[in-house]
Amino acid sequence: MTTKSLGSFNSVISKNKIHFISLGCSRNLVDSEVMLGILLKAGYESTNEIEDADYLILNTCAFLKSARDEAKDYLDHLIDVKKENAKIIVTGCMTSNHKDELKPWMSHIHYLLGSGDVENILSAIESRESGEKISAKSYIEMGEVPRQLSTPKHYAYLKVAEGCRKRCAFCIIPSIKGKLRSKPLDQILKEFRILVNKSVKEIILIAQDLGDYGKDLSTDRSSQLESLLHELLKEPGDYWLRMLYLYPDEVSDGIIDLMQSNPKLLPYVDIPLQHINDRILKQMRRTTSREQILGFLEKLRAKVPQVYIRSSVIVGFPGETQEEFQELADFIGEGWIDNLGIFLYSQEANTPAAELPDQIPEKVKESRLKILSQIQKRNVDKHNQKLIGEKIEAVIDNYHPETNLLLTARFYGQAPEVDPCIIVNEAKLVSHFGERCFIEITGTAGYDLVGRVVKKSQNQALLKTSKA
């Protein structure tokens, strides 16, 4: 999960200060940025300090129990720290699908907003009475909305769709976000150009299911995402384009060809596979089989040897036998996945999987997670050792979270916030964050690489070197 306090921005009103906390995924962060943009446009002022805020907006995640527990912890903290008469507004997925879990805090909450109702943030904080507005619609249907970026200046997320057509047995997202609603091409192009004109160097396309983009706008069975990529890549400018959240059967041959041929489209995909055993995949109501997954991975790595693949898997799905888990462990051990997120199955109410027999004990799930983590760590160690001595082009992100004596950087195989990074311990040549430099890899630290800047990039454009 990602926890992000949105930064301070200039405004003209000093007594109407707002403080945002955005929990969960990058899609939630974009929603928070839209709400922040609406309030700044109305004349409110953002503050980094909870104690200074007149309005505290908590944008929640509800995908897993752990995410809901995090939101409750933040509510307790806000209640303890906020100044007298400051109002708390809770929005996001938790209000849409788990409002009952907020009952113990309702006397402290001024307003509830559904995850699709962010355009009502102004009326929520200005309401004299406590209340709520919760629906499954989306501000995407409104067209253009204000937005205040909160990410570092050199990268930003671009949400191209809301909702999901899939019905995975373990997932509550469709019930929260509703049906698929894609932004029209002209709206996306307008937002894209705004980002490029702001000198954003890395634009990350996101949706609940990016590969389904446009399928609600057209009866054409060809990939609408591929068409969108072609249009975006026609745009002039110095930028990288990254894709997150795709199903393996949605990555067309044309998209693969673009990754290989166009230096602006990063050879990186985030594909949540969830499992590899056919019976489990069927029980999960996934759309691909083991054979299809392996065929896709083989084709992708053959056509784009330098590609980096991120994925996620679930351990302890109801009925998962030791043999079926071992099949997953063997698959992970083969090293197909570069960056892996491993999740314990969470029994979510009102999902088909919650009603399945043979729910797996927590201790067994935790043991299986530990085994997969150890396997993936060996894969990462083996790969990272091959990179020692290599000079890799990377973007300088920020200071290291633990000390300003170190910097963090990322090369094309590392997405912000979810993947490991490069820890830079020698950076005399760096003049600003967002700059692209060549970094010599000198060592490793856990999942991260360690290196020193040896020279600046000449044309500030990505050079796609082969993977080690």
From Swiss-Prot:
Keywords: 4Fe-4S, Cytoplasm, Iron, Iron-sulfur, Metal-binding, S-adenosyl-L-methionine, Transferase. [4Fe-4S] cluster 1 binds at C25, C61, C93. It is an enzyme of class 2 (transferase). Signal peptide: none annotated. PROSITE patterns: MTTASE_N, MTTASE_RADICAL, RADICAL_SAM. GO terms for molecular function: 4 iron, 4 sulfur cluster binding; aspartic acid methylthiotransferase activity; metal ion binding; protein methylthiotransferase activity. [4Fe-4S] cluster 2 binds at C164, C168, C171. The keyword S-adenosyl-L-methionine applies. It is found in: Cytoplasm. Residues 150-382 form the Radical SAM core domain. GO terms for biological process: tRNA modification. Disulfide bonds: none annotated. It comes from the Bacteria. Residues 385-455 form the TRAM domain. The keyword Metal-binding applies. HAMAP family: MTTase_RimO. NCBIfam families: 30S ribosomal protein S12 methylthiotransferase RimO, MiaB/RimO family radical SAM methylthiotransferase. This is Ribosomal protein uS12 methylthiotransferase RimO. The lineage of its organism: Bacteria, Pseudomonadati, Chlamydiota, Chlamydiia, Chlamydiales. The gene is rimO.
